[in-house]
Amino acid sequence: MHRLDKDTSGIMICAKNDAAHLSLSQQIQAKTAQRTYLAVVRGNIKTDSGVIETLIARDKNDRKKMAVVKEGGRDAVTEYEVLERFGKYTIVRCRLRTGRTHQIRVHMEYLGYPLVGDPKYSPMKTPFSIQGQALHSQTLEFTHPRTGERLSFEAPLPEDMHKIVTRLRLGQFN
């Protein structure tokens, strides 16, 4: 139904049949299915929340990456909310209004706050032990295609991200 970038942890939805696929696709298109992510970014985000609205397209210099562009891209909208600040790092909740490839990673890097451990958009070494970027698909909310019941699912943080958050809360690496 939707993709998770390589090395992004968390919850995904898969359709069991064609009718469910159609219903869920329509919900994603109509933005009635909600997807929320947690990220640990490098830097101290000053604003408590915001909306990032840009165009995103393939990077001209590296076809494996995406980039914010002035024209010729697809609309990409990400809402973000700062949950905790730790000197050099911030924990942020992101909600997708659109679902572009690498959208959160590109948007946070565009603001100057790349994801910790992101090998594509933030190749700097990190003091944390993490496989890939610190990005977790935390919640997914949608209407059941057959029953019409509103469903909400939440995935706990993976161990490596949980350790990062714990170390930040203990005052390490601030």
Predicted regions span which residues?
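RNA pseudouridine synthases
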Residues: 1-174
